[in-house]
């Protein structure tokens, strides 16, 4: 007998089911919410500070002085520009800032010269014209005359501006850039005597003087988050991106470290105990020093938690260690605010005027702290005046505390909040920094980011400059009275910050030079001092490689000596004080020794930053001083400061004891470099604390002369009335810095609205443009374009990789060819393709652009044409008048066109006459003129293209130059060949060729072609364009190609139109491969890209419109036809110096007829047209104009390669299988068997044998993908993008 029982109704089941459901809800809620990180309640002994090794000094000039490498070409260009005017010429030197491979120093490489342009809205200030991301800018002043040793590079305003820029970078939230921690200027005195060029070079730089010491300690547990696991793996984010990464450290209640990214919005609201870094090899890297500066002086950090000794943590994920390294880092001078240091270098240089550039053109200099007298005095005086100004401009202490919630002061909160703010009008707007620097559209009234700091409105709103510390601890001197008497000097008083013990120290200033142990790799003889018959250098500098000592012991070979006797240090202190130095009183009881030889100063500027509540209990009767209130005796260091104030930074929780004691006995580590300031015993609740007489503390091992000096402290402690923490002075409860940011953004928004309004008005006014008739004569067209562009009063320039086209000088501007056939529509087509597919590699961009040299075009013609031909063709490109805010290159070129087409043998007018109509710029017509230019570019008729190309193909119009009459029949060929050879020599290519022979041998021709193809290998970058994916997808074009049909289909569907898809389908559907003669050039908007390796940065596709016109007009690059089908033989560039043979022409013509007989009617019409063009090209190939060097890139010209029949005794290594032809198939320009080894060894071109124009090639086999781009199949596939 069985009975069914329902257990669901029992009480036990209900209870068990209820418990399980409750547990599931709890687990679900715990998984859905993020567990909060609670900082340990006790902030003492957060980690074990026991040292595990010797400490390391952190400063970018600690082990090696900064090195400066200057290009000889940049100096020559600067002298060429300077001699055009009598007054001092201001310009810019551009370069790159890099860390050395051993990470013991930094190197500044200056390789470009920029003449600069006048800044809009300012009288005489200039800005660089071709600045790229990552460029290091050095303002330079060039004067002509006899040099002097008493040259002052900086002005007081320059020093103040440098101080402000260094402080603002350390206080802000922008990405930390080590190059912005060095502000540099130069002064060059230039003298020319006969063939000698004499340069007096003066370099001066301002940097941050604060240093740190890092000591290895035992590992601290780390919470295994995703970030920590990624940094500990071999493929971490820093390794993949090829750069270093940094962030901050906090702790949870179990005293485990939590790694936080610097971009985390909550990072500034957490108590931070240190920093972490990844992608760095050594702890002494300058990147670590910069990260420590940002951690100490950042105004956005809410709370810094330091150890009992005032140190913070550093976790280094080194590239050479599997496990992270742990260090305890401490500032070397705890009570100092942000300090500055002056580095200078002086040297002389002799060059020969007409000599070639040496093989190693980089001139080496070294910046040292052994400063010049006048420069150092001005630096000291500026620091002194700025300190006095800071005291006068300090705001009065406010009696309201930030902890008082009824005070009306709103704390600025940068964390995201879902609820609306009380003041929506000042809601924070994030700045957007674009990451596409390749494309630039520059107006004459552009916004300069530097103008924010120089804006008079900002100055009136911010009554005082930036500060190195947050404002709530920055008013230590506000309520301090003036001293009644000077501090009493004593023998054991700290008078300066000394280096490690030297064998002997005297009483003069030279005794403060640091002792050097390691031979630095920087100590080598410059190459221009060894064996050079062209350069003589007088090392009169105090910072040359021989006279300047090294800055410190390298951690790789020497062991730092830490400990020493206190008596020895006292003797050193007493003997090393420089003579003639007077203490500079920073406040009533704060003084600093100022040394003229070592001008390291700490200048504090009030920072208007946000205020946050104190973590500890506020003490309104205590003064938050900058100094570390530490009393020192002979053998012990005692802390007697409050727990909620810390020197030189805001909200540094320093927990040693709960109340300030009357007697202090706690001992600190002996290697800390601390002294007792005078204001170390504040009056607290009626209790008075005293400090013992000051003794020296053992100096840290890494000290050197570049560090700031310690203050001179008196014996007695004075009572000073404490100032109260002031409130924010900004608008609507915000700080002034935040309000200034919002006001600046509001100003930019208003300006943008006004611009949009003007554009709309101009567009409405020109809604019905009148269509102009197309002139039949090209000269009439040029005159018309000039007349329309004369109305443009404001300059506009749009460019890609601006400056890349100025890599070479013109060979010989004796004759020029017409540029009518390349109109603006072709420029627009080429621009649209290459901008979308171009790779942005900053390193290659910087390396390919050598100099912005406008004058070099006109100067080189004097050397090439023996001085008998003027540089009138390029005179419109020069800018000597200071009234032009931005040069309109395209307009100047059109003006030059009209002048060259009007009359024969007329002298060229100067620049002022050409551009007389461009001086006044009415702003209301600016956008109308801009729209007129854009419409002119976009509405160019295709009929005009055909007329122009037909005219040039039939008869090649050779323009007469605006120069003195020469004898073209006798000297033209010879001059062209000499100019070509000289141009090659200037590029470092030496060709042994007899200049008297006009026709070079075929072996020399091939060698020249191979050399020209490998001149600039670093600029060869694989790009994404139509040729790139067609080559990748077809194994017939690439010897080791792979089948990437799906990717090719997807890209073709997205980027190609119907006609291009049909042509690609026809070219691959034919199994006999007869239709390959349909050149892929017709699928491209121009004929500039003929090969994969031709897609370098110095190719015409990366030039601006105006630059491309300029280069093509003067024969510097090849000219391409704007039509899609007709080939261009007129302006095709040729590497060969031999004329085309008639045999090869007839052979090509015969091959055309055979290919048409085979039934391939698709290309018959095109081949007939090409065959007709061959006849007209026979005489043109003999013309000496074609012997010019047109294309100095890595691409083989797709237009014409003329190679005479081979000789058996002179075999060609590169073109032996290539027959003479007038056009190459772009798809076959595969140069190397392995593309990754393109520019190494003997490069062999054309692995396949090309037979005429048919496009036939020996494919790898029948397995090639012939239907990759079938149109029917493409339309059926889904779009992948």
Curated annotation (Swiss-Prot):
Keyword field contains Cytoplasm: yes
Residue ranges of the region described as Disordered: 390-431, 450-592, 765-790, 879-915
Superkingdom of origin: Eukaryota
Major localization listed first in the record, in broad terms: cytoplasm
InterPro entries: Sil (IPR026123)
Regions of compositional bias (Polar residues) in chain numbering: 390-401, 461-475, 528-560, 567-592, 770-790, 891-913
Entry protein name: SCL-interrupting locus protein homolog
Protein's organism: Xenopus laevis (African clawed frog)
Name of the encoding gene: stil
């Amino acid at each position: 007998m069985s009975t069914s029982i329902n257990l669901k109704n029992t009480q036990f089941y209900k209870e068990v089911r209820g418990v399980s459901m409750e547990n599931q809800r709890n687990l679900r809620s715990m998984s859905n919410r993020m567990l909060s990180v609670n900082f340990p309640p006790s902030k003492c002994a957060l980690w074990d500070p026991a040292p595990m090794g010797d400490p390391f000094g952190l400063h970018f000039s600690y082990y090696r002085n900064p090195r400066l490498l200057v290009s000889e070409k940049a100096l020559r260009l600067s002298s060429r520009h300077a001699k055009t005017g009598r007054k001092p010429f201001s310009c810019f030197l551009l370069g790159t800032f890099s860390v050395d491979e051993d990470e013991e120093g930094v190197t500044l490489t200056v390789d470009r010269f920029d003449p600069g342009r006048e800044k809009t809205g300012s009288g005489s200030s200039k800005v660089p014209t071709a600045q790229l991301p990552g460029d290091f800018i050095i303002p330079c002043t060039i004067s002509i005359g006899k040099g002097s040793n008493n040259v002052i590079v900086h002005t007081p305003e320059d020093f103040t501006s440098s101080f402000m820029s260094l402080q603002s970078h350390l206080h802000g939230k922008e990405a930390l850039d080590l190059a912005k921690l060095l502000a540099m200027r130069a002064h060059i005195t230039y003298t020319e005597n006969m063939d000698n060029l004499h340069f007096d070079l003066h370099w001066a730089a301002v940097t941050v003087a604060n240093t740190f010491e890092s000591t290895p300690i035992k590992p601290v547990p780390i919470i295994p988050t995703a970030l920590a696991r990624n940094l500990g793996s071999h493929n971490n984010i820093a390794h993949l991106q090829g750069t270093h990464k940094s962030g901050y450290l906090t702790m949870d209640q179990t005293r485990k470290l939590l790694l936080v990214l610097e971009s985390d919005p909550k990072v500034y609201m957490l108590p931070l105990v240190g920093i972490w870094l990844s992608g760095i090899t050594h702890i002494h890297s300058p990147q670590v020093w910069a990260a420590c500066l940002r951690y100490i002086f950042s105004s956005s950090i809410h709370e810094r938690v330091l150890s009992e000794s005032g140190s913070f943590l550093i976790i280094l994920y080194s590239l050479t260690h599997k496990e992270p390294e742990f260090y305890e880092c401490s500032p070397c001078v705890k009570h100092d605010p942000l300090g500055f240091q002056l580095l200078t270098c002086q040297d002389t240089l002799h060059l020969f005027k007409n000599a070639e550039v040496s093989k190693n053109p980089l001139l080496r200099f070294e910046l040292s702290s052994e400063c010049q007298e006048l420069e150092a005095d001005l630096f000291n005086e500026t620091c002194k005046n700025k300190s006095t100004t800071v005291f006068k401009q300090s705001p009065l202490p406010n009696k309201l505390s930030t902890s008082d919630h009824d005070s009306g002061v709103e704390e600025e909160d940068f964390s995201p909040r879902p609820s609306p703010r009380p003041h929506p009008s000042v809601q924070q707007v994030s700045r957007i920094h674009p990451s596409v620097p390749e494309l630039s559209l520059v107006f004459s009234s552009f916004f300069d980011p530097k103008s924010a700091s120089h804006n008079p409105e900002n100055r009136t709103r911010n009554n005082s400059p930036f500060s190195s510390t947050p404002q709530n601890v920055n008013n230590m001197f506000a309520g301090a009275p003036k001293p009644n008497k000077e501090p009493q000097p004593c023998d054991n008083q700290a008078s300066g910050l000394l280096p490690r013990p030297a064998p002997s120290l005297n009483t003069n200033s030279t005794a403060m030079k640091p002792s050097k142990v390691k031979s630095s790799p920087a100590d080598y003889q410059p190459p221009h001092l060894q064996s050079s018959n062209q350069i003589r250098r007088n090392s009169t500098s105090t910072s040359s490689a021989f006279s300047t000592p090294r800055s410190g012991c390298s951690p790789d070979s020497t062991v730092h000596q830490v400990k020493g006797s206190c008596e020895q240090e006292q003797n050193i202190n007493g003997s090393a004080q420089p003579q003639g130095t007077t203490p500079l009183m920073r406040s009533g009881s704060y003084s600093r020794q100022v040394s003229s030889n070592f001008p390291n100063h700490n200048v504090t500027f009030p920072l208007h930053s946000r205020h946050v509540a104190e973590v500890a209990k506020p003490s309104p009767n205590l003064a938050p001083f900058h100094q570390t209130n530490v009393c020192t005796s002979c053998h012990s260091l005692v802390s007697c400061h409050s727990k909620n104030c810390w020197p030189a930074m805001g909200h540094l929780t320093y927990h040693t004891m709960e109340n300030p004691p009357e007697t202090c006995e706690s001992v600190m580590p002996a290697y800390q470099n601390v002294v007792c300031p005078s204001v170390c015993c504040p009056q607290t609740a009626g209790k008075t604390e005293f400090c013992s007489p000051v003794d020296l503390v053992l100096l840290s091992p890494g000290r050197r002369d570049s560090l700031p000096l310690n203050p001179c402290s008196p014996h007695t402690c004075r009572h000073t009335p404490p100032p109260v923490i002031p409130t924010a002075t900004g608008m609507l409860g915000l700080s002034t810095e935040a309000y200034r940011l919002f006001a600046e953004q509001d100003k930019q928004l208003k300006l943008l609205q006004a611009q949009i309004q003007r554009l709309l008005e101009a567009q409405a006014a020109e809604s019905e443009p009148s269509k102009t008739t197309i002139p039949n004569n090209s000269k009439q067209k040029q005159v018309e374009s000039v007349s329309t562009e004369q109305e443009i009063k404001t300059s506009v320039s749009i460019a890609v990789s601006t400056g890349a086209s100025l890599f070479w000088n013109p060979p010989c501007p004796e004759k020029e060819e017409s540029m009518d056939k390349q109109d603006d529509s072709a420029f627009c087509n080429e621009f649209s393709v290459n901008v979308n597919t171009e790779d942005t590699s900053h390193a290659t961009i910087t390396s390919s652009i050598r100099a912005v040299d406008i004058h070099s075009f006109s100067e080189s013609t004097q050397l090439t044409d023996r001085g008998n031909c003027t540089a009138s063709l390029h005179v419109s490109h020069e800018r000597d008048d200071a009234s032009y805010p931005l040069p309109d290159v395209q307009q100047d070129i059109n003006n030059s066109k009209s002048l060259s087409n009007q009359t024969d043998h007329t002298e060229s007018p100067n620049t002022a006459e050409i551009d007389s109509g461009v001086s006044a710029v009415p702003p209301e017509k600016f956008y109308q003129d801009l729209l007129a230019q854009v419409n002119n570019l976009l509405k160019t008729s295709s009929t005009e293209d055909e007329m122009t190309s037909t005219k040039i193909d039939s008869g090649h119009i050779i323009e007469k130059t605006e120069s003195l009459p020469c004898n073209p029949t006798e000297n033209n060929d010879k001059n062209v060949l000499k100019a070509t050879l000289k141009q090659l020599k200037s590029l470092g290519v030496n060709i042994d060729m007899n200049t008297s022979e006009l026709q070079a041998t075929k072996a020399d021709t091939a060698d020249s072609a191979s050399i020209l193809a490998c001149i600039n290998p670093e600029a060869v970058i694989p790009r994404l364009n139509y040729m790139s994916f067609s080559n990748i997808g077809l194994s017939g074009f690439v010897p080791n190609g792979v089948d990437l049909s799906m990717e090719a289909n997807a890209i073709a569907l997205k980027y190609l139109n119907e006609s291009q898809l049909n042509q690609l389908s026809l070219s691959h559907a034919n199994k006999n491969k007869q239709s390959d003669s349909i050149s892929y050039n017709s699928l491209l908007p121009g004929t500039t890209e003929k090969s994969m390796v031709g897609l370098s940065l110095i190719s015409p596709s990366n030039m601006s419109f105006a630059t491309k016109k300029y280069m093509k007009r003067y024969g510097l690059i090849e000219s391409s036809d704007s039509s899609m089908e007709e080939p261009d033989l007129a302006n095709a560039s040729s590497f060969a110096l031999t004329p085309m043979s008639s045999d090869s022409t007839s052979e090509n013509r015969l091959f055309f007829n055979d290919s048409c007989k085979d039934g391939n009617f698709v290309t018959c019409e095109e081949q007939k047209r090409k065959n007709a063009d061959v006849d007209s090209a026979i005489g043109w190939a003999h013309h000496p104009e074609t012997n010019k060097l047109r294309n100095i890139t890595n691409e083989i010209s797709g237009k014409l390669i003329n190679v005479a029949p081979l000789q058996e005794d002179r075999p060609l290594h590169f073109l032996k299988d290539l027959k003479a032809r007038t056009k190459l198939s772009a798809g076959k320009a595969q140069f190397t068997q392995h593309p990754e080894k393109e520019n190494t060894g003997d490069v062999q071109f054309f692995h396949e044998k090309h037979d005429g124009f048919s496009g036939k090639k020996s494919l790898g086999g029948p397995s090639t993908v012939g239907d990759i781009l079938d149109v029917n199949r493409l339309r059926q596939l889904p779009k992948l993008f």
